[in-house]
C-alpha cells in the first residue's frame, strides 16, 4: 500500500495530511480556506487519491502560510508514499477544459524540484482567495515532493475556471505519473538507476 501521513507544526500553522495514492478519490478536507478545500477536492477526485487534510493556521492575518504549508506537507506525503519510485511511470500530463478555460500540466518525478507556472489570471482574487497563493502552494509541493512541474493555462476568461482546470489537470497528471507500470516492476524509471 502506498499510503503516508505527515504532520507539520510551525509557529504559523499545524497541518496533517494523510493520503493513499491508490485510492478512489475520497476526501476529508478542513484547511480553514474554503477555496483551497475546493481545489484539493479536485486533486483527490481527478487523481484518484484518497486525501485527508486538516489545517489550523494564522488565517486571521492572511491565508498565505496555510496555503503554502499545505502544499509543503502534501509534497512530503506524496514523496513518502511513493517511496523509492520503483515501477512508477514517472511522467504524467493532462489537458483539462472547463468551459472557456484550458490548462495543461506536466509532471516528472525526477528528484529535481522545479516549477514553471504560467497562468495569466484575469483577476487577482477568486472570492476572497488571492490567486498568487496558488503559486506558493505548487512551489511548496514541488520543493518537498522533488518533482519538476510545468503548469500552463492555455486560455481562459474566468479566473475560477482557470485555476480549477489547473488543479484538475494536476490531479490527472499526478495519477498518471505515480501509476505502477507492470512492465517496469521493480525498476527505477531512469537510465541512471536512481531518481
From Swiss-Prot:
What is the catalytic activity of this protein? D-erythro-1-(imidazol-4-yl)glycerol 3-phosphate = 3-(imidazol-4-yl)-2-oxopropyl phosphate + H2O
- Name where it mostly resides: cytoplasm
Q: Name one Pfam family in it.
A: IGPD
Cited InterPro entries: IGPD_sf (IPR038494), ImidazoleglycerolP_deHydtase (IPR000807), ImidazoleglycerP_deHydtase_CS (IPR020565), Ribosomal_Su5_D2-typ_SF (IPR020568)
Taxonomically, the superkingdom here is Bacteria
Please state the pathway this protein functions in, per its UniProt record: Amino-acid biosynthesis; L-histidine biosynthesis; L-histidine from 5-phospho-alpha-D-ribose 1-diphosphate: step 6/9
Q: Which GO terms describe its cellular component?
A: cytoplasm
User: Which keywords label this protein?
Assistant: Amino-acid biosynthesis, Cytoplasm, Histidine biosynthesis, Lyase
Q: Tell me, what is an example of a GO biological process annotation in this record? A: L-histidine biosynthetic process
Q: What is its EC number?
A: 4.2.1.19
UniProt-recorded Gene Ontology molecular function terms = imidazoleglycerol-phosphate dehydratase activity
PROSITE patterns per the UniProt record, alphabetical: IGP_DEHYDRATASE_1 (PS00954), IGP_DEHYDRATASE_2 (PS00955)
Q: Indicate where this protein resides in the cell.
A: Cytoplasm
**Family to which the UniProt record says this protein belongs:** Belongs to the imidazoleglycerol-phosphate dehydratase family.
What name does the UniProt record give this protein? Imidazoleglycerol-phosphate dehydratase
This protein's gene is called: hisB
Amino acid at each position: 500500500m502506498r499510503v503516508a501521513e505527515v504532520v507539520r507544526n510551525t509557529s504559523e500553522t499545524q497541518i496533517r495530511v494523510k493520503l493513499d495514492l491508490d485510492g478512489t478519490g475520497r476526501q476529508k478536507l478542513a484547511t480553514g480556506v474554503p477555496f483551497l478545500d475546493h481545489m484539493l477536492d479536485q486533486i483527490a477526485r481527478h487523481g484518484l487519491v484518497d486525501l485527508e487534510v486538516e489545517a489550523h493556521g494564522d488565517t486571521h492575518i492572511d491565508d498565505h502560510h496555510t496555503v503554502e504549508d499545505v502544499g509543503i506537507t502534501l509534497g512530503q506525503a506524496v514523496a513518502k508514499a511513493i517511496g523509492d519510485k520503483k515501477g512508477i511511470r514517472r511522467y504524467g500530463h493532462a489537458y483539462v477544459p472547463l468551459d472557456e478555460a484550458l490548462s495543461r500540466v506536466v509532471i516528472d518525478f525526477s528528484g529535481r524540484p522545479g516549477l514553471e507556472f504560467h497562468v495569466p489570471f484575469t483577476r487577482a482574487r477568486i472570492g476572497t482567495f488571492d490567486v498568487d497563493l496558488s503559486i506558493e502552494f505548487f512551489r511548496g509541493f514541488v520543493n518537498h515532493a522533488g518533482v519538476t512541474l510545468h503548469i500552463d493555462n492555455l486560455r481562459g476568461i474566468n479566473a475560477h475556471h482557470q485555476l480549477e482546470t489547473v488543479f484538475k489537470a494536476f490531479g490527472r497528471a499526478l495519477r498518471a505519473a505515480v501509476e505502477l507500470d507492470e512492465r517496469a516492476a521493480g525498476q527505477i524509471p531512469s537510465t541512471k538507476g536512481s531518481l
